[in-house]
């Protein structure tokens, strides 16, 4: 079953990364302070990037990896998503698709 990996911009400029079956519903939860603990204290302002993954395990694995990145590397994923996808496909031998 497909899952989405999403990246949100917060009011303070930070980037939140998460996983959901329905990223738009989850985005609404983040906006209404019903989302993650982090987004309750760091107000979400917009969706920056969304990727479609073939499974929850792939999405969660990528989420965990991205959360360890420094901000500059996260910004590169947002600004150059095709490079990120190419790297993931070459290194991890998995397919993901840019949605937004």
Curated annotation (Swiss-Prot):
Pfam families: GIY-YIG. Gene3D superfamilies: GIY-YIG endonuclease. It comes from the Bacteria. Residues 1-77 form the GIY-YIG domain. CDD domains: GIY-YIG_UPF0213. Signal peptide: none annotated. PROSITE patterns: GIY_YIG. Belongs to the UPF0213 family. PANTHER family: UPF0213 PROTEIN YHBQ. This is UPF0213 protein FN1575.
